[in-house]
């Protein structure tokens, strides 16, 4: 199994509606798990390059990626589509994000409700419809619920 993941650093319109001179920005990279400190540094640099008051997010893929499949698909796409060298990074990220290039099949639900009863019911629904035992379903509290 590979420790390769897709990372997305972005500043979205949705989060920055009232920020003067804001322009939506995003950067997608493919990184190994052991390079997470480098990704955090890139995140801080990306955020610092924004306008004052801009909110920036970092997303790390839940499922690791299969390097061999990514390499093969990238080579095929480079030959088939005659990709410009200026588009290599975005093409690599696009290939890496494809469902068939993941190593795992984990799910992530963003349940933005701060109500213990609703969270419990939601977890029971996930258990019921997926047949995944409750002991394998993890939950994490975030700033929004």
Question: What residue spans do the PLM features occupy?
Answer:
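Signature for HUH/AEP ssDNA processing cores
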Residues: 1-142
